Amino acid sequence: MTSFQPLHSVTSQSLTGKLQGFHEALLADYPHICRLACAIYDKPTDVLKTFINSTRQGHAIAGYEVKLHDTPSLLHLANHQQSRVIDDISAEIHGGSVHSDWLLEQGYMSSFTVPIIRQNQFLGFVFIDSVEKDSFTPSIQRDLIMRCASICDAIANELAAAHLLVATASAIRSIANLRGFDAGMHLTRMAELSRLIARNLPAHFGLTDEDIEHIYLFSPLHDIGKIGIPDAILLKAGRLTDSERQIMQTHVQKGVDMIDSILADFNLIEANDARIMRNIIAFHHEYLDGSGYPFGLKGEQVPIEARIVTVADIFDALTHKRPYKKSWSVENSLTELHQMVEQGKLDDDCVTALANSLNAAQHIVTSYCDSEEPASNPGY
């Protein structure tokens, strides 16, 4: 077995770190700018969601998303590729929405909003806030737009790279043409469930919106190595024999090798988001008591992103019908997860985060239903 250690840091700087450095440099000329934040747009769902921020005053808003078409003022900016200045927030912004109420509570006095546009595509917004009224004169606006180009490029490039990695891995999976491999909506549910858990974890885990977005993007790749497992084992409609289970468990190392090859091809092996991707693929079958595979990691050795995906994967397997089992109710599935916590296998915070979001979990289970196609054997 190839040795593989959890990656807790990489040499490249995260987008959050880059934004904080950009803010630090900006303060030399504009000391009144107390907050920079970027929200990204997901076109298929019309969702605008918080992503990265550098906040010197007030409390950062995190885990917030809204339909762009439900915010006419921002929709106008996106459609017309225009920036916007609010010279007096207290006079021009009225409460009533989560974001407006939050903005008024922070004590910011003026703001400047710049759309992120690349290749004529709207990707999101940069929000710049000041502790002074009338901070953003026309000349300052022009300067900030030019300066923001670098951070906008960084965001656009990283999002493009992340989506390219996912698309490449998905293409490999499709080319393999494995009948029933992760059929139906399993991968969509994995992304949604993993994000749900990550968003509801206690603050001490330190997950940023940037981290959560990467977990959302990369959790569907957790079992990518299964494309190297023979169909007779992958699609077996019953319990695996010991020898079959050993072969099934090699999908983890196969997945790591595959993703490392893709990362190397795109020169992304040191990218910050590569850490989360590799940890998910390598460690999503590890249990906290050391009884998992293939590395037998224990406790804190298992990265939080892997613990999240493990809980999401088991929950999804329990709540959906498979050739070898009937579907369980959400309530019974959560009971099973809690029992696995008591056995020392699963992270208590991750299971609690899911249990505390019962309605959202139920919505994911019922909204993304499987077809009648068979799914791969999880090999647990």
What are these regions (language model features)?
Residues 109-117:
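A short, aliphatic-rich beta-strand micro-motif
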Residues 124-135:
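Short beta-strand-to-loop transition segments that serve as allosteric relay/switch motifs
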